[in-house]
Amino acid sequence: MNTYTENEIKTLEWNEHIRRRPGMYIGKLGDGSSPDDGIYVLLKEVMDNSVDEYAMGYGKQIVISISDKVVTVRDYGRGIPLDSLIVAASKMNTGAKYDNKAFKKSVGLNGVGIKAVNALSIDFKIQSYRDGESQMARFSKGILTEQERVLTSEKNGTLVTFLADEELFGNYI
């Protein structure tokens, strides 16, 4: 008897796929005890976006902090276009680095990196500041939980804060 039927064919949402197959996106998971552990890849992916802005001449400062396993990266570049913030953080293969119009230099994964960080984090917050307005989106395991758009006096740029999921990374360093 053949047990391979239509019921065995599954389609995963983008975040489910990343969470089930993180090795495709960040290499091995790891707890930080090895320099190639995925926990460091998450940090690098967020930093790379800020470095791209800096390398293009936008913003002269990148602030990185880690406290109680919460990583925060703030750049003072152009900021992500506000109406594209949620899509940029949660729709696979979406980004501005596929051609050289907006980014002549890029070290990022071109539409994948920040989504992997989002999906592999228990708490992921991204906020863009542009020309007196701010758009914020918060996710848990890649699922949008909160969003807000407000007026602001903050300088242009992007703020990303994340707490990696200990279910996946263990008690990481």
Task: Please report, for each region that a protein language model flagged, where it lies by residue.
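GHKL-type ATPase core
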Residues: M1-E8, K69-S84, A96-I173
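Residues immediately flanking
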Residues: N15, P22, D48, D75-Y76, ...
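Conserved ATP-binding N-box helix of the HATPase_c
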Residues: S33-I62, G113-L120
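Short strand->helix junction
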Residues: M24-Y25, G32, E53, R78-G79, ...
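Conserved, well-folded catalytic cores of nucleic-acid-processing
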Residues: R21-Y25, S50-E53, G57, K91-G95, ...
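Conserved beta-strand-loop-beta-strand hairpin that lines the nucleotide-binding pocket
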Residues: D48-Y98
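Short loop/turn elements that form and flank the Walker-type P-loop nucleotide-binding site
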Residues: L12, R19, Y40-V41, G57-K60, ...
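P-loop NTPase nucleotide-binding/switch module
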Residues: N2-G38, D83-K105
